[in-house]
């Protein structure tokens, strides 16, 4: 406790970025009310859309299905990371193929098989310790975009272990790159949920835009991720 107090009093301030996320709001559910627009998030570019700001990461695909299932109360009697493991297995086994399009920064819009996931992140870990974006750090001045598309169900199941350890990049076509803007839409099936800092509050079509220098975070004088880029937790 004293260490936390000391950090609050004498810690080092760092400026970090944020991702502005815009898309249609997630629908209402008996176990989870529809998200409410807040004026502090700013006005949407498209009427009826919801705007949220992410200070950690936003993601979609199997991961957002998992979060929505959690919000709906599935496996509610199971606690901890085991809940997410069971939810992920169920989401993968019930996954139905659909396609969509993506656009990264100023590149062309590209069709993709959405069997898999994406994560636009400013930190290394999420979901109870999964190292989704190895080496990403909040002070890097851009987001790290991880994509895993066109996976079979066995591949999605097989990716869970490497994903937890940060050993998934390059496996089965999984990529990671720097990105400032990501557009995700034209989904052939039902709209896909998107997580914003762990909450499935937005659906496709959606845009994600990184903005630097948005928030001051106070912490230790020296943090590992600034030295080596190896630990991006925040």
Outline where the language-model segments fall:
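ATP/nucleoside-binding phosphotransfer catalytic cores, i.e., glycine-rich phosphate-binding loops
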Residues: 106-113, 131-234
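Short loop segments at secondary-structure junctions
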Residues: 24, 123, 150-151
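Residue-level signal for well-ordered alpha-helical segments
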Residues: 43, 47, 79-81, 95, ...
